[in-house]
Amino acid sequence: MTKPHIVIIGTGGTIVSSGTSGAQMTGYSIQGLDVRSIISAVPALAEIANIDALPLLNIGSSNIKLSDWLKLTCTINKLAEDPNIHGFVITHGTDTMEETAFFLNLTLKTEKPVVLTGSMRPATAISADGPLNLLNAVRLASSKQARGKGVLVSLNGQIHGARDVSKTNTVSVETFCSPSSGPLGYIIG
């Protein structure tokens, strides 16, 4: 069976950040790594899909601007024209992930899965959540069931729709919820 082709687009955020020690959970450097670093830290990705990395931005999500959203939209819309690409994962900071997801949900012109993911702990933390979140996001973007569902947010094993998701906690790995509807699903595996 042919593996799906997934493009992982890096925009920065905690998922590619680094601290000075494994115990540092705050005050870390956002400029530490890029999306290729986190991909290489998760070799199981190659078992699920053929991966292309696209480091598009490297910013803290609190600094994202309309021009960045437009760049992301144009990039995905252009890449989505390629029939060999099955879906997209966007690594993103959690501060504005829900806003980016909502904007993309309104502006993208593709039925292909688009999944935003990130982390609450830097890549260098003892129990970094980014690698598993990335793995689960690729699993979701590779799923035929995710096609046509709009932009999705996946962290901590949960799947949320862009229209309903909210960040409700600034320190816990269980940071996102969909208060009015609940999660669309869970990733188990």
What is each model feature region?
Residues 1-189:
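Active-site histidine-anchored catalytic micro-motif
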